[in-house]
């Protein structure tokens, strides 16, 4: 059996795919003039379809997002089917809260590496002062230097050295190198 024949006999869903694309294209075509729409390549049309889908999903999730530029030009109808021109109370509709970076940090906790940088340098991690576990207790006793002071003390003298010198291992056996002279230098 030839592989090309098997591909030709396989059932295809071109009718369903083209129907979905046609509906999506009709949905987007209302934002463009006929001339603009005819000049556009199908790949550009697909990009606009996905831009609109992304806008719809983000607004349904509760994010405050701006309209894509192509949807702003006509302002014909939003994705819910409301007519902007006839809706006088459009501005009075309930706005969803805007997600900020801080609120996202509360939702998704920080992912810490297994070995923080302080532990690699021989320093221990000091827990944060805020939170229900600590209840305002003093984390660093007055006699002990704080983590910041330890970092400043350890990093101060290293500033003059190269950054990679602490990574070099010390040789256990000394190697003595002999200088080889060039015959050209001997002639002089």
Curated annotation (Swiss-Prot):
Database matches in Pfam families: SSXRD
Compositionally biased spans, kind Basic residues: 156-167
Source domain of life: Eukaryota
Ranges of compositional bias, category Basic and acidic residues: 116-127
Region described as Disordered: spans on this chain: 116-167
Residues covered by the KRAB-related domain: 20-83
Record-level GO BP terms: regulation of DNA-templated transcription
Cellular compartments per GO CC: nucleus
Keyword field: Transcription, Transcription regulation
Compositional bias ranges of the Polar residues kind: 145-155
Function: Could act as a modulator of transcription.
Family: Belongs to the SSX family.
Name of the featured protein: Protein SSX4
Organism: Homo sapiens (Human)
């Amino acid at each position: 059996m030839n592989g090309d024949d098997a591909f030709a006999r396989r059932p295809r869903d071109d009718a369903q795919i083209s129907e979905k694309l046609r509906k999506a294209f009709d949905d987007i075509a209302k934002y463009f003039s006929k001339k603009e729409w005819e000049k556009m390549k199908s790949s550009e049309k697909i990009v606009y379809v996905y831009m609109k889908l992304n806008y719809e999903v983000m607004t349904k999730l509760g994010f405050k997002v701006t309209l894509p530029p192509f949807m702003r030009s006509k302002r014909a109808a939003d994705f819910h089917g409301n007519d902007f021109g006839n809706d006088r109370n459009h501005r009075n509709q309930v706005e969803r809260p805007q997600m900020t970076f801080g609120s996202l940090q509360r939702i998704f906790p920080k992912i810490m590496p297994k070995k923080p940088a302080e532990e690699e340098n021989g320093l221990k991690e000091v827990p944060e002062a805020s939170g229900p576990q600590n209840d305002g207790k003093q984390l660093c006793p007055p006699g002990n230097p704080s983590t910041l002071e330890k970092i400043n003390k350890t990093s101060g003298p290293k500033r003059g050295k190269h950054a990679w010198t602490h990574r070099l291992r010390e040789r256990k056996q000394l190697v003595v190198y002999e200088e080889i002279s060039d015959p050209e230098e001997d002639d002089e």
